[in-house]
Amino acid sequence: MLDIDGSWGEGGGQILRTTLSLSAITGQPIRLYQIRAGRQKPGLSAQHLTCVRAAATICNAEVRGDKLRSTLLEFIPTRPPQAGHYTFDVMDAQEGGSAGAVTLILQTILLPLAIASEESTVILKGGTHVAWSPPISYIEQVYLPLLSKLGLQTELHLQAWGWYPQGGGEVHLHIKGNCQLQGVELLERGALKQVKGLAVVTELPSHIPQRMAMRCEKLLQQAHVKGYVQPLRAKGVAPGAGVFLTSEYEHICAGFAALGRRGLPAESVAQNAVEQLLSFHQQDAPVEEFLGDQLLLPMILAQSPSQYRVAHISEHLKTNVQTISQFGLAQIDLNLEDRLVFVKPGHNLT
């Protein structure tokens, strides 16, 4: 059994998600201890517990420690990941807490199901647009399109918006199995073709998304960036608001999000999102910071090496390198000065 310290590095839930994915894929039993030990509320939250149960379901794992606030987990797969029709609901684990992010569950089970022998359909219920996690709009516009370049084929449909803390969102994901991933090189992003976005609210007046969209477009215009932001008023189980922007470059896309909250003007939400976008645009890296650590897992499973240049080598990225290295599946090297990441899958090691 492989022992992994969940408090290492930035010590967050990413260690858990990466470990679960690789355990399911390789069949390697793991013992994860000190889970999220440095957090204000250590241990497994509802979204982390749902990740555990989802990963266990697809590989029929024997699990010990799968309860809220647990800081110790044993996870023993008994079969390779199995394709199928699955439904995972964060509310099943929340016990009065907030609705966690379905995108984190998606990223936990995506690659195990992609290498399964058949197609899979997954329904995820909970928070679709939640702070401190990638919103489903980012997954749809940035993450999955890039993985398609590696050879992973998916279809994603947002059925209902779900905000923190009520949740109530729903996502349908179709994953084509038997995936053979190929490495990629992401060193140049090319020219900016356009910026597109969505300013959305649920259960709030229609003037709010209109104000957010207008403010976004005005700020982009002032920066001499062409962009169109669509205002949208949708139905949901609770009020919520957000701006989701995508910068489309010649070779890659980058995504940026800002969520509304009570008392925060619509224009401030828009400005937050645009400032993130312009800050990245002023750099020359093709891969933005948050995508940087999310690319490692698919790249170590590819048939050929990958390399990419990232806007910032974050603690999340360094922590993910450390977590992955314990499975011995790849050689990952970081060039801190040039912000380069080199990934050499295990079957390419000499």
Curated annotation (Swiss-Prot):
**Residue positions of the active site:** 316 (tele-amp-histidine intermediate)
User: What Enzyme Commission number(s) apply to this enzyme?
Assistant: 6.5.1.4
Query: Source organism's superkingdom?
Result: Bacteria
Q: Could you tell me what reaction this enzyme catalyses?
A: a 3'-end 3'-phospho-ribonucleotide-RNA + ATP = a 3'-end 2',3'-cyclophospho-ribonucleotide-RNA + AMP + diphosphate
Annotated compartments: Cytoplasm
Under the cellular component aspect of Gene Ontology, which terms does the record hold?
A: cytoplasm
Biological process GO terms, please? Answer: RNA processing
Q: Where does ATP bind?
A: 107, 290-294
| Record-linked InterPro entries | RNA3'-term_phos_cycl_insert, RNA3'_phos_cyclase_dom, RNA3'_phos_cyclase_dom_sf, RNA3'_term_phos_cyc, RNA3'_term_phos_cyc_type_1, RNA3'P_cycl/enolpyr_Trfase_a/b, RPTC_insert
Entry function: Catalyzes the conversion of 3'-phosphate to a 2',3'-cyclic phosphodiester at the end of RNA. The mechanism of action of the enzyme occurs in 3 steps: (A) adenylation of the enzyme by ATP; (B) transfer of adenylate to an RNA-N3'P to produce RNA-N3'PP5'A; (C) and attack of the adjacent 2'-hydroxyl on the 3'-phosphorus in the diester linkage to produce the cyclic end product. The biological role of this enzyme is unknown but it is likely to function in some aspects of cellular RNA processing.
Q: Which named protein is this? A: RNA 3'-terminal phosphate cyclase
Gene encoding the protein: rtcA
